UniProtKB/Swiss-Prot annotation:
It comes from Chlorobium luteolum (strain DSM 273 / BCRC 81028 / 2530). Belongs to the universal ribosomal protein uS13 family. This is Small ribosomal subunit protein uS13. One of its GO terms (molecular function) is structural constituent of ribosome. Residues 92-125 are annotated as: Disordered. Part of the 30S ribosomal subunit. Forms a loose heterodimer with protein S19. Forms two bridges to the 50S subunit in the 70S ribosome.
């Protein structure tokens, strides 16, 4: 079954499978299934065409998913960088944005370590 250009895994429960679509988390998936009248523990492979169509329609009409959600997020970050606010500067420098420590941690955001050679000990005479 495809939703918003994403193939959903057939062997998983509907609530879990929907989270494979970018922009749909656990809470949103539960809301979609509740509005479509589908039990969250039903497998995707067990859904009939009408139920699949109902999910597709809800997602297409009411939610920003995949490319649209990614694009909006990128525009929001670009706006922060353009206005030159603190958060924008942190994004531009690839540093943590939300106040985390950077002296010892933040390796995910900063990337691999750039090794700097230590001072050489002066030879004794």
């Amino acid at each position: 079954m495809r939703i918003a250009g994403v193939n959903l895994p057939l062997n998983k429960h509907a609530v879990i499978a929907l989270t494979h679509v970018y922009g749909i988390g656990n809470t949103t998936a539960k809301t979609i299934l509740k509005r479509a009248g589908i039990a969250p523990d039903r497998k995707i492979s067990d859904l009939n065409d009408a139920e699949a169509h109902a999910i597709r329609e809800l997602v297409a009409e009411e939610y920003k998913v995949e490319g649209q959600a990614r694009g909006e997020q990128q525009l929001a970050i670009k706006r922060l960088m353009d206005i030159g606010c603190y958060r924008g500067l942190r994004h531009r420098r690839s540093l943590p944005v939300r106040g985390q420590n950077t002296q010892t941690n933040a390796r995910t955001r900063k990337g691999k370590r750039k090794t700097v050679a230590g001072k050489k000990k002066a030879a004794r005479k």
